[in-house]
């Protein structure tokens, strides 16, 4: 039996903030360039916390018109949902972003990165960005789904 040869895989531990050492691990195939602002893959073992699609409205149901403000609030909302489930930002294993205008996202990438780090720190899970025609909430410019795994 022949085993196909492919790239070897590096499994790197994530930053330890005093949490369990059994937390998520970054999956980075050997020889691949290091990603910036996301992970190529994440492996984790524990209790799964999943959000629905989260938009940038506040507790009063107000949705700002500004794209960056919507992203900042959506990320804050995700942090609140994670906390409700006993998860912290370092437990994130996946974020899927849905935007109505990818050019708007790219034009604001630097400030979006700053907002992300203010809320989640420098932990970057696996991420995907998808442009859509529109979101259910017509005024929403971004919707984000999150998955976290809390170590046992």
Question: Whereabouts are the PLM-identified features?
Answer:
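N-terminal presequence-like segments and the immediate start of the first folded domain
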Residues: 2-93, 99-152
